[in-house]
Amino acid sequence: MIKYGILFTKKKWGIYMLKSWTPGEMPDKEEMKMQLEKTKSRLYDLQMKIKEHKLPVLVLFEGWSAAGKGSMIGKVIKNIDPRFFKVATMSSPTEEELRRPFLYRYMKQIPEEGKFTFLDSGWMEQTVMDVLTGELEGELYEKRIESIRRFERQLTDNGYLVLKFFMQIDKGEQEKRMKKLLDKEDTKWRVTGADKWQHKHYKKCENVIDRYMKDTNMSTSPWDIIDAKDKKWAELQVMDTLVSSIEV
């Protein structure tokens, strides 16, 4: 396991949540390139172990707008046989889904034995949005959190590997990335009104996210905060965590 910054401390669950988190030291480019190739190769090899041991792996990617959640999933799945994974991007719930228990639509995405499911945002994003809009507070919030903790515990108790990544960038980096997208005709559509609102209210969103992460950080399904300012460094952190978690 690579002993750089966050990778070295990630198993100390319950300590490094968002507001108290600081990025680890990024390795030099040559070291990073070498380690990334090793972890990619190892992840490719571990597919058969996952299949043989019938290990279902659920990987949840959360993070700030423009932090690179979708592109990171794209990089990871390049190293996995398409037969062994699926990717789910969770849009706004339908009317039918709103009538069902909150976690219903996520339960439908859990992986089969020996396969991966990668979720591009999930129950964290929806919960944070519900808090920010005032729909979820007090006892309702506590019940939601307890249902999420119970859901994740049930998965891990039944042999699922649950990994939760939060792609972290600061407000300045987010502004820079959004401006780059908005400046080009073919990419400006990617910045939504919700993205702009989040950027304007970055601190408020950070407070809600930080509380949520503390409330749902468990030894069996801890949060891994990924320093996403540098894309290659972010990829190495994610790949190393995937490999080391499967090898345990």
Region locations from a protein language model:
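A glycine- and Lys/Arg-enriched "phosphate-lid" helix/loop adjacent to the NTP-binding pocket
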Residues: 131-147, 153-207
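Charged, amphipathic alpha-helical linker segments immediately N-terminal to NTP-binding catalytic cores
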Residues: 14-35
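Pre-Walker A adenine-sensing motif
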Residues: 42-51
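NTP-dependent small-molecule kinase module
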Residues: 205-248
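Post-Walker A helix-loop "phosphate-sensing" segment adjacent to the P-loop in P-loop NTPases
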Residues: 79-86
